UniProtKB/Swiss-Prot annotation:
Uses described in the biotechnology field: Phytic acid is the major storage form of phosphorus in plant seeds and, thus, in seed-based animal feed. Phytases are therefore of considerable economic interest.
Taxonomic lineage from the root: Eukaryota, Fungi, Dikarya, Ascomycota, Pezizomycotina
Positions annotated with a glycan in the UniProt record: 27, 59, 105, 120, 207, 230, 339, 352, 376, 388
Protein name (record): Phytase A
Pfam families: His_Phos_2
Active site: 82 (nucleophile)
Subcellular location field: Secreted
Disulfide bonds: 31-40, 71-414, 215-465, 264-282, 436-444
Gene that produces this protein: phyA
Similarity annotation: Belongs to the histidine acid phosphatase family.
Organism expressing this protein natively: Aspergillus awamori (Black koji mold)
Tree of life domain: Eukaryota
Enzyme Commission (EC) number: 3.1.3.-, 3.1.3.8
Job description of the protein: Catalyzes the phosphate monoester hydrolysis of phytic acid (myo-inositol hexakisphosphate), which results in the stepwise formation of myo-inositol pentakis-, tetrakis-, tris-, bis-, and monophosphates, as well as the liberation of inorganic phosphate. Myo-inositol 2-monophosphate is the end product.
EC class name: hydrolase
Coarse class of the protein's main subcellular location: secreted
Length: 467
């Protein structure tokens, strides 16, 4: 099985190692900030599933996300999704063709549909939008400030999955991190900027814990597609009928209804007015329809890469075992998606650091969240009826893997506690751990946390990948 990685030379990151200050944000809007993320038009934008921009869940956390009094963080790990992007090339072609079809067949564009008559699909493909770049700058700033007792004196070890938008996200994170450090009078002087230390290939034959792709049975699964089609059929037909009535001359499919809903997010995050103006696509749908759309995205993630798929959590086992190695300063023990060449080399997988940052995609992160058992309290999601966030025990695609999402794993030493404690935050929401005895703040001792990851330590169900 092939393995591949690229060690990035410093000159490739010259733009983020030169000590330049962070460029002024596209906006200084109070609804889009470093601490709270994207709170603009939240009644709609927070219902875009994985196409939602990062928004902080600190106010949704039953446990304060602040570092508890009497404790000091001794280890911090962030796992981040890339920032807001343009549609993928394949989806973009479908969106463009649909809009062209509407324009060619509809005779009258009235009211809220008027914009469609002259709308020109000109979005990019695959890469980060300027807004998405700023999301990661902000993420780097926030990470530095949150863990400043460590970041002032330590250079984080950084890995990225091999997609260009993921690498660019890591670079923008570094930009925010380093510019904040340079302005901190208490930071250790003379330290070099962080860099992306390892890029892991996304080739289909490569072992990659950030973006697994070598479990054949899992890759061939069509479960999520079936669930998606069935749930779409519960809410899209009524929307389709309304659109066809209002846009006389066009015939749509249920899937094309969801494409038009996708355009609400993509058209919004691709503009310079992202903080002041929603795309006109958004107004074509009601609040209840957005609730259904958001739940559809959650179903796709849960049954595609989460516990709803028999091999979903197993895809995250390799990363979970790497996390165990980092927390315990011991070699990686894993025979699933880990890259033995990289993980056995201190240059590409050091065990003596206390600050780590990894960058990846939404699907891989979903599997990792479930491999860590963070949503063991989530019962199988209904495939016919919308369930609210309480019923799903805090799981939704928008709450877990929006653009620029971030998982923080913290280890802390606290007064009157001999053993270090571990806790996890997902987008600033403390997620009480499962599989180990937790305290009132959702934490476990490090050793009990590791013992609780027995699913990962035993390799999950990887043996079934080639069944």
């Amino acid at each position: 099985m092939g393995v591949s990685a690229v060690l990035l030379p410093l000159y490739l990151l010259a733009g983020v190692t030169s000590g330049l200050a962070v460029p002024a944000s596209r906006n200084q809007s109070t609804c889009d900030t470093v601490d709270q993320g994207y709170q603009c038009f939240s009644e709609t934008s927070h219902l875009w599933g994985q196409y939602a921009p990062f928004f902080s869940l600190a106010n949704e956390s039953a446990i304060s996300p602040d570092v508890p009094a009497g404790c000091r963080v001794t280890f911090a790990q962030v796992l981040s999704r890339h920032g807001a992007r343009y549609p993928t090339e394949s989806k973009g072609k479908k969106y463009s063709a649909l809009i062209e079809e509407i324009q060619q067949n509809v005779t009258t564009f009235d009211g809220k549909y008027a914009f469609l008559k002259t709308y020109n699909y000109s979005l990019g493909a695959d890469d980060l939008t300027p807004f998405g770049e700023q999301e990661l700058v902000n993420s780097g700033i926030k990470f530095y400030q949150r863990y400043e007792s460590l970041t002032r004196n330590i250079i984080p070890f950084i890995r990225s999955s091999g997609s260009s938008r993921v690498i660019a996200s890591g670079e923008k994170f570094i930009e925010g991190f380093q510019s904040t450090k340079l302005k901190d009078p208490r930071a250790q002087p003379g330290q070099s900027s962080p860099k992306i230390d390892v890029v892991i290939s996304e080739a289909s034959s490569s072992n990659n814990t950030l973006d697994p792709g070598t479990c054949t049975v899992f890759e061939d699964s069509e479960l999520a597609d079936t669930v998606e089609a069935n749930f779409t059929a519960t809410f899209a037909p009524s929307i389709r009928q309304r659109l066809e009535n209002d846009l006389s001359g066009v015939t749509l499919t249920d899937t094309e209804v969801t494409y038009l809903m996708d355009m609400c997010s993509f058209d919004t995050i691709s503009t310079s007015t992202v903080d002041t103006k929603l795309s006109p696509f958004c107004d074509l749908f009601t609040h209840d329809e957005w609730i259904h759309y958001d739940y559809l995205q959650s179903l796709k993630k849960y049954y595609g890469h989460g516990a709803g798929n028999p091999l979903g959590p197993t895809q995250g086992v390799g990363y979970a075992n790497e996390l165990i190695a980092r927390l315990t300063h011991s070699p990686v023990h894993d025979d699933t998606s880990s890259n033995h060449t990289l993980d056995s080399n201190p240059a590409t997988f050091p065990l003596n650091s206390t600050l780590y940052a990894d960058f990846s995609h939404d699907n891989g992160i979903i599997s990792i969240l479930f491999a860590l058992g963070l949503y063991n309290g989530t019962k199988p999601l209904s495939t016919t009826t919308v369930e609210n966030i309480t019923q799903t025990d805090g799981f939704s695609s928008a709450w877990t893997v929006p653009f620029a999402s971030r998982l923080y794993v913290e280890m802390m030493q606290c007064q009157a506690e001999q053993e270090p404690l571990v806790r996890v935050l997902v987008n600033d929401r403390v997620v009480p751990l499962h599989g180990c005895p937790i305290d009132a703040l959702g934490r476990c001792t490090r050793d009990s946390f590791v013992r609780g990851l027995s699913f990962a330590r035993s390799g999950g169900d990887w043996a079934e990948c080639s069944a």
